[in-house]
């Protein structure tokens, strides 16, 4: 696990997909911040989906007591979401490499109708 600093002074842990999957099994919530189109094409089952553009307005929907792991396609947008949420007091990590790394690790993801997912 690596960390990155940001302007808020909060260090954001950078997690590999396998570590994110393990933490998810232990109660952490995966937060997908990609676009609707990306999410429909392929997503991890049972994630919380809030686009990056909606994070500030919808942060109140998240439980600050449950650790979050933000993810996007490659890791940039989720890093921005993680920084924003950390500044609001959430415990949040970023999944390094995003859905591209999740797919490369051979981990499962699906389309909105339950079929095999695609990272776009």
Residue ranges and their predicted role:
Residues 71:
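Short, surface-exposed ligand- or partner-binding patches at beta-edge/loop junctions that are enriched
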Residues 1-29, 36-67, 76-120:
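Rhodanese-like catalytic fold shared by cysteine-dependent sulfurtransferases
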């Amino acid at each position: 696990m690596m960390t990155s600093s940001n302007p808020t002074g909060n260090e954001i842990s950078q997690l590999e997909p396998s570590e994110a999957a393990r933490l998810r099994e232990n109660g952490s919530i995966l937060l997908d911040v990609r676009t609707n189109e990306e999410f429909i094409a392929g997503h991890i089952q049972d994630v919380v989906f809030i686009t990056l553009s909606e994070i500030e307005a919808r942060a109140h929907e998240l439980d600050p007591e449950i650790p979050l792991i933000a993810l996007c396609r490659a890791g940039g947008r989720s890093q921005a979401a993680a920084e924003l949420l950390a500044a609001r007091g959430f415990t949040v990590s970023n999944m390094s490499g995003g859905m591209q790394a999740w797919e490369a690790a051979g981990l499962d993801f699906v389309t909105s109708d339950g079929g095999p997912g695609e990272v776009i």
